[in-house]
Design a protein with these regions (language model features):
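Aliphatic-rich helix starts adjacent to a transmembrane/signal segment
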Residues: 1-42
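Type IV pilin-like appendage domain
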Residues: 58-136
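Residue-level marker of positions within ordered structural domains that often coincide
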Residues: 10, 41, 76, 98, ...
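Transition segment at domain starts
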Residues: 22, 32, 49-59, 64, ...
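Sequence contexts marking disulfide-bonded cysteines in secreted/extracellular proteins
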Residues: 47-51, 67-69, 108-112, 160, ...
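Short linear sequence signals and composition-biased patches located at protein termini or domain-edge surfaces
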Residues: 114-170
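Glycine-centered small-residue hotspots that permit tight backbone geometry or close packing
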Residues: 1, 44, 79-81
Length: 170
């Protein structure tokens, strides 16, 4: 019996580690998607007469179309979409070289100052895509796709997709 247990323990341990890696990847991607969806949901909100574009979908140089999104909303309820400073109302997310990056106060998908949102040694982002469609009732609907893979084990990957109603957009 002891010999049988000794043979099965390494297999059980390996499976347990793999389940843990799947769970960590799933949780990391879901948390990231939740934050992006929150900003997409707020896009276009203004407590006054805001000027500018509330939504920009594009891509960084060398990346796929739709792999960068910049949204504006009136986070301070000042009636403006501030473009710079700690109260900036522009929030950007882009795919670049297998990493998802974010920046506040940004107006274009290229350029510097973007920060990686995840540890590149843990997670590689394979796909980030945002597209806008019309929902059943004619309102704007953002479709978000996010796919990532464990940097330590390429067999562990996860794809997420979801839709977000953007009520403040026409």
């Amino acid at each position: 019996i002891a010999l049988g247990a000794a043979k099965t323990y390494p297999l059980l341990r390996q499976q347990s580690v793999a389940v843990g890696q799947h769970f960590r990847l799933e949780s990391t991607l879901r948390q990231l998607a939740f934050g992006i969806e929150k900003d997409l949901r707020r896009a276009g909100f203004c407590a006054g007469q805001c000027a500018g574009r509330p939504l920009l979908i594009g891509q960084a140089a060398g990346e796929a179309a739709g792999s960068c999104v910049i949204v504006a909303y009136d986070i301070t309820r000042s009636g403006q979409w501030l473009t710079s400073g700690e109260d900036a109302g522009y929030f950007g997310y882009r795919l670049r070289n297998g990493a998802l990056e974010g920046q506040r106060g940004v107006s274009q998908c290229d350029g510097g100052g973007w920060e990686r949102l995840l540890d590149h040694d843990e997670v590689r982002i394979e796909r980030f895509h945002v597209a806008i469609e019309r929902g059943e009732h004619g309102g704007a609907l953002a479709r978000l796709t996010l796919a990532g893979r464990s940097a330590s084990d390429a067999r562990i990957g996860r794809n997420l997709s979801g839709s977000v109603e953007m009520a403040a957009l026409p």
